[in-house]
Curated annotation (Swiss-Prot):
Assigned EC number: 6.2.1.5
Transit peptide as recorded in UniProt: 1-25
UniProt-recorded name of the protein: Succinate--CoA ligase [ADP-forming] subunit alpha, mitochondrial
Description of how the protein assembles with itself and partners: Heterodimer of an alpha and a beta subunit.
Main function: Succinyl-CoA synthetase functions in the citric acid cycle (TCA), coupling the hydrolysis of succinyl-CoA to the synthesis of ATP and thus represents the only step of substrate-level phosphorylation in the TCA. The alpha subunit of the enzyme binds the substrates coenzyme A and phosphate, while succinate binding and nucleotide specificity is provided by the beta subunit.
Phylogenetic placement of the source organism: Eukaryota, Viridiplantae, Streptophyta, Embryophyta, Tracheophyta
Locations listed in the record: Mitochondrion
Record has Ligase as a keyword: yes
Amino acid sequence: MAASARRASQLLGSAASRLLHARGFAAAAAAAPSPAVFVDKSTRVICQGITGKNGTFHTEQAIEYGTTMVGGVTPKKGGTEHLGLPVFNSVAEAKAETKANASVIYVPPPFAAAAIMEAMEAELDLVVCITEGIPQHDMVKVKAALNKQSKTRLIGPNCPGIIKPGECKIGIMPGYIHKPGRVGIVSRSGTLTYEAVFQTTAVGLGQSTCVGIGGDPFNGTNFVDCLEKFVDDPQTEGIVLIGEIGGTAEEDAAAFIQESKTQKPVVAFIAGLTAPPGRRMGHAGAIVSGGKGTAQDKIKALREAGVTVVESPAKIGSTMFEIFKQRGMLE
């Protein structure tokens, strides 16, 4: 009788302990402030497509960088482990078990839109889709679903991802070129993002957060979404914007910069100055059509908003450094 009483007491104690732990976790989660620009060291990430070649490689890289990777999703492989992380059959299961609030998607193009929708239905705060070549018809449906909700933010698709140097890397960017610092970078081009990162690191300014928004016509996060965050972020003292031909995203960014009256210096580069009309230049969205979306139009709009537009990507870092110097912003 005494033994069974002791056992009951232990079970009750264990249950109470679990309850207190859960309450403590919930309180900590509630107390944690939202990241200034989408991610920080508290971001808990799962990988959709974790057991595939790309998912495996980039999850290893993220773990090595220090990102809080908490699990992965591969249908029919739930209950297994991969890279020391639990694998689940669905995003909803993964979120319930790991308290993840972000996902990165390395899923082949025919299935990527469904993966995005699944992450949205699980109401993750952030979904980063790296996949290139998703059918535009699929992305129209995703965009419509995104616009009907306010819980989930999508970055991408067809993008390098997002990184807060030294804290959280979600995507395919090389971590070692980044340095925690003062410049926020937002770009439609992956490789030009790396160029801007390398240069701002080389001149000693570093980066606050870098966001690759992707080069597809239908993406989840645009220049203005990122600029709003950078303008309000105290760590971001300068902004680099890298655009390209096609669409009106850069003109919208110029209008926002003008309206915001921000005093933070903005340096921009627009790719595709010599692109012939009607020809797609690398990205699905990089096309001048109907006489609209030219580099000249974008450069003009940005300069009228007070942005310093450089003619060559090689000048991004040195130009930002000179502006910091002129304004007495260098320590």
